Amino acid sequence: MIRIYHARILTMQEDQEIFDGEIWISDHKIQYVGPENKEEAAKIAWERQIDAKGNLIMPGFKNAHTHSAMTFLRSHADDMPLLSWLNDQVFPYEAKLTPDDIYHLSKLAIMEYLTSGITANADMYLTPDTMIQASEDCGFRTTVIGAVNDFTQIGRASCRERV
């Protein structure tokens, strides 16, 4: 088990203020959140104990609108009008991505999310299966929404037929 003690804890329960306490974790699940319990803690052979003095522990954030694999385009062609940016910069790069590229870019994004306290997202991108696999491989929670664009010749022809 893991014990995190001397922590300031925010639980998001409506009737509870931030309090000083500790958290016990076993098998990747929180077993206890509450005031420090030194007497009970002394009876346990801890795998790890973390002194969180001066730190706040709070629930993870959720990002409700992501395009995770687009991390590689961050700061690429900034300060452009949206349609120019999409049509002239983003779409040509995305058209060359393989599912394997998208998988690894999604894992990169997940690592960035986790270091920022984001523990779940809703992701919209070209190949939802790759985000699902990357999320499973990283132990990350995600909801995926398929893309509405298709850069393949078949996809373009199909869109033209529908219009």
Locations of regions flagged by a protein language model:
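Active-site beta-loop-alpha junctions enriched in small/polar residues
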Residues: 67-69, 126-127, 147-152
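N-terminal metal-binding scaffold of metallo-dependent hydrolase/deaminase domains
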Residues: 1-43
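Divalent metal-coordination and catalytic microenvironments
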Residues: 7, 23, 28, 54, ...
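Alpha-helical scaffold segments that flank or form the walls of functional sites
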Residues: 74-140
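Hydrophobic faces of well-ordered beta-strands that scaffold small-molecule active sites
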Residues: 62-64, 121-122, 142-146
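Metal-coordinating catalytic core of metallo-dependent amide/deamination hydrolases
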Residues: 132-162
